[in-house]
UniProtKB/Swiss-Prot annotation:
Organism: Saccharolobus islandicus (strain L.S.2.15 / Lassen #1)
Keyword Cytoplasm assigned: yes
SUPFAM superfamilies (alphabetical): N-terminal nucleophile aminohydrolases (Ntn hydrolases)
NCBIfam families (alphabetical): arc_protsome_A (TIGR03633), PRK03996.1 (NF003075)
Cleaved signal peptide residues: none
Annotated gene: psmA
Protein name as it appears in the record: Proteasome subunit alpha
Quaternary state and interactors: The 20S proteasome core is composed of 14 alpha and 14 beta subunits that assemble into four stacked heptameric rings, resulting in a barrel-shaped structure. The two inner rings, each composed of seven catalytic beta subunits, are sandwiched by two outer rings, each composed of seven alpha subunits. The catalytic chamber with the active sites is on the inside of the barrel. Has a gated structure, the ends of the cylinder being occluded by the N-termini of the alpha-subunits. Is capped at one or both ends by the proteasome regulatory ATPase, PAN.
Domain of life of the organism encoding this protein: Archaea
GO molecular function terms listed in the Swiss-Prot or TrEMBL record: threonine-type endopeptidase activity
Amino acid sequence: MAFGPAAMGYDRAITIFSPDGSLYQVDYAFEAVKKGWTAIGIKSKSGVVIASEKRKAQSLLDVDSIEKVFLIDDHVGCSFAGLASDGRVLIDYARNIALQHRLIYDEPVSIDYLTKSVADVKQMYTQHGGVRPFGVALVIAGIDKSVPKLYMTEPSGQYMPYQAVAIGQGYYTATEFLEKNYKEDLTIEDTILLALKALSATLKPNEKLTPNTVEIGYASTQTGLFLKMTSEDKNMYLQKL
């Protein structure tokens, strides 16, 4: 995204709107999200699934050390696309919110409240000088009292509930795939397969998903627990694609 000299004053200041109603630094934060690895969230009647790709950014990097699906509390998890350091900070914040809620109220935090709390922090960083927006979008999913919940938060602080959502480099292709193939009455197994198929659709023709290049988290309405899938289980589902 490029702007001419007339726009430079609005470009430098985070708190000043341009004449066309834009906050350019927030727009740039959205561009950072589009450069991130693709992550997909799907909600069905049987539960929720988050699937995210992992790539080796450097040849000597230990890919096993890369984490792309995160447990926030027993019933909720998340993934992100964008700046990894920004994602880590917001995930730690979400975990603290969940922990404080358990300590004070002796019950799991609602996913609605958790998402709003994270989105509020993001929004605050769009209206104060001396800071910059978070260059990251989060997919938050889990089970609230046997009800599946799925949200996505944007760098602007906006958050919305979704049936299915994609973020990152392949969001456009994945969204098109999900719009054509999504069904609400999927089993949790079929929801996992749909997420993997949507993620596969974003790859180049000579690429394919492997247990080392994808992370999957899921929660079913039967257990209410958000779990990360093992390599053995990932391999089993990938063989069904």
